[in-house]
Regions:
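Hydrophobic residues in well-ordered beta-strands that form the structural core
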Residues: 82-84, 108-110, 236
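C-terminal helix-rich "cap/oligomerization" subdomain common to oxidoreductases
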Residues: 19, 31-34, 48, 52-61, ...
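Contiguous beta-strand/loop segments that form the cofactor/metal-binding neighborhood of enzyme cores
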Residues: 163-241, 268-280
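N-terminal Rossmann-like dinucleotide-binding module
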Residues: 1-35
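A contiguous active-site-proximal alpha/beta segment in oxidoreductase catalytic domains
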Residues: 46-51, 88-148
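NAD(P)-dependent dehydrogenases' Rossmann-like dinucleotide-binding region
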Residues: 111-115, 127-149, 160, 164-168, ...
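C-terminal glycine/acidic-rich active-site capping loop/insertion
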Residues: 230-291, 301
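Beta-loop-alpha module in the N-terminal Rossmann-like domain of NAD(P)-dependent dehydrogenases
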Residues: 5, 33-100
Length: 301
């Protein structure tokens, strides 16, 4: 992710520094970007540098060290922080740090970049044109046969729903509103690295949108969101694309829209960074992320 952020920051003509840990990774980073990172990690950097009140940090470390780095950065007085999702290795770790971060939550933002996909912005425009969203269905199936063999830090795969699937869940309820009256179901599967593998649920959101979801990590499937208005069904599947089924027809056709920025950069990242630097209120702040984790993600599990 650090390489993707550098590409965006360079394109936006921003002045920035990069903090790395090891010599080998720093040398590789310099070879790829032409930028020499500060070596030694965040602790060493903060020991030798004083942060200005308007200093902005982007934390793009491995999932397992997101929270420790965040604690160091806010303790040192960072003015604003964008931290990669989901800001902690587990929901438990996030909630354990709630009190420590509570008074700082309005300046910490979680990088759910799919909110800024060109496809999502286009879908929002279409929903508004049609008079609003009526119902929604989403799926966050993960390919367990691919994820299982991956070598990850302890705790990452065990919390894969939180670390990865919440990309879909966050976006779904960002578009439809927060669930209010709803039920969720989940069950164990045969994989040994994640407690639950089969999920379903349904209900209504605070904006009156009916919703349902399903996910079976040991069957076929993929990420996707279906958005139903009075005039059409909008498909975000894949989520970078957009397809439409018009009311009274059975054909599902690709919808053309301007997504060049998501071809030039990692999808959603350019607009996300732009928002972080200029209009952070459009991002998910840490306080809301904590609430979602407690009230939605834990219930889905």
């Amino acid at each position: 992710m650090a390489l993707d952020y550098v590409k965006v920051l360079n394109a936006q003509k921003k002045t920035f520094s990069v903090i790395g840990r090891g010599e080998a990774s720093a040398a590789k980073f310099k070879e790829q970007t032409g930028i020499a990172p500060y070596v030694g990690g965040i602790n060493k950097y903060l020991e030798n540098n004083t942060l200005q009140p308007d200093t902005k940090f982007i934390i793009a470390t491995g999932t397992e060290v997101l929270m420790p780095v965040l604690r160091e950065v806010v303790a040192a007085g960072a003015g604003r922080v964008l931290i990669e999702k989901p800001a902690a290795v587990s929901i438990a770790e996030l909630l354990e740090n709630e009190q420590y971060l509570k008074n700082l939550a309005d300046k910490i933002f979680v990088a759910y970049n799919r909110r800024f996909y060109s496809s999502v912005i286009e879908a929002q425009k279409m929903i508004k044109e049609d008079g609003g969203l009526q119902s929604m269905h989403f799926e966050f199936t993960e390919w367990a046969h691919i994820i299982g063999p991956l070598e990850k830090a302890p705790g990452v795969k065990e919390n894969w729903f939180f670390a990865n699937s919440t990309h879909v869940v966050d976006l779904a309820f960002y578009l439809a509103g927060s669930p209010t009256d709803w039920r969720s179901f989940s069950k164990h599967g045969t994989i040994d690295w994640h407690e639950k593998t089969n999920f379903a649920g349904a209900g209504i959101t605070d904006t009156g949108v009916l919703f349902s979801y399903i996910s079976n990590w040991e069957s076929a499937g993929r990420w996707g969101i279906e958005l139903l208005t009075a005039k059409r069904r909008i498909y975000l599947r894949p989520m970078e694309g957009l397809s439409v089924q018009v009311k009274g027809t059975v054909a599902v056709n690709e919808h053309e829209f301007d997504n060049q920025i998501d071809k030039d950069f990692k999808p959603g990242l350019y607009k996300q960074v732009e928002a972080f630097l200029t209009q952070p209120e459009s991002l998910l702040n840490l306080s809301d992320h904590i609430d979602k984790s407690r009230e939605i993600y834990q219930k889905m599990l």
